[in-house]
Amino acid sequence: MNLPEINTSLFTRLRFILVETSRSGNIGAVARAMKTMGFSDLVLVNPRFPDALTDAEAVALASGAQDILSGARIVGSIAEALEGCNYAAAVSARLREFSPPVTTQRAIAGQLAAGTELHAAVIFGNERFGLPNEIVEQCNVLINIPANPEYSSLNLSQAAQVVAYECRVAALGDGQLASPVGF
C-alpha cells in the first residue's frame, strides 16, 4: 500500500517550552507526550529544581522518552528559549483582558502545519499559576483549550499532549492517522 507523502517538517519546526515547572514528573510526562506525537525540541525556563531533567520522577514518567529529556535545554529566560523561533503561542486556561488573539489548539495546529516558514514555540506555564502576563503578551496567539468551563485546568502534561496531538494530526493530513498494528 502506497501512503501519500506527508509533510513532516512541523515535527522539527515546533518547540515546546515549559516555564518554571515545579514538578519534575510533569517534565517527564511532557517528554513522553512529545515523543508519542513525534516532537523532540523541549526547552525549560528556570525549572524549580536544577536537576529536573535527570530527577528520578522525570525519568520514570518519561517512560521511554529519556532521549527527549537528555536532548532538552535549560535556559534562564523566555528570550533564550525563543531563540530561533519566529512565532510563539502561549497556552493557558485563563483568558486575559489584554492578550494576543485567542485561538484553539486545532486552529493553530493547522496554521503551523501549513506555514512551513514558521519556526514556532508553544509555551506552557507552571502548574500552580500558569503563564505570567508578561510572557503571554510577547506571544502571537493565546491557545485556550476548550475544556469544561466548570473545571478547565488541565495538568501540564495533558495540555501538552492535546497540543502535540492536534499538531501531529495537522502535519499528517488526511489519510495518515492510522498507526501500525502492535506496540
Residue ranges of each PLM-predicted region?
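Post-transcriptional modification and biogenesis factors for structured RNAs
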Residues: M1-F183
